[in-house]
Amino acid sequence: ESLNTVLCGLDYGEEGCGILATQTEHNSVLRPLMNQPVLKKHPVTIISCLENGAVTRKALEKGLEEALENTGKNPSALIVNHCSNVTGYVQDMKLIGNFPRENNLLLLVDVSQSAGCIPVDADSWRADGVIFTGHKSLLGIQGTGGFFIRKGLELKPLKYGGTGRNSQQL
């Protein structure tokens, strides 16, 4: 739920501005990117990783170029997992964190595999959003999770309902 809330609630700019994601992203990231109607307006470019799962500066640059070639527009976000559930590789987030700033991209980090067992430092990574699940190393129950987004970044609501009062206001 938290991944869908963040991925579908962010403003990625005009239609056609793409999203970069690494090839080692968890299905809980890739499935919304490929299937949520709101995200279909923003083509996804998959960034290659080394065999061990590492994302290199060269791969980030190549992914950015590929996205620009395919859409004619700069992508608006980079999504990367801190630690891969497939390879166990822990990304160098300080290296990765500079790339989005240099290229005017939002940086979203999935820390579901690492939160609770490896330090998570959104500030030093310069992350715009950090998303996690509670049922892994945070030892929460299945179905729990959450996210952090930086101050000033807003999410559009995915669900609407009553306020309990002020019914005249829509």
Model-found features: residue ranges?
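Pyridoxal 5′-phosphate
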Residues: 1-170
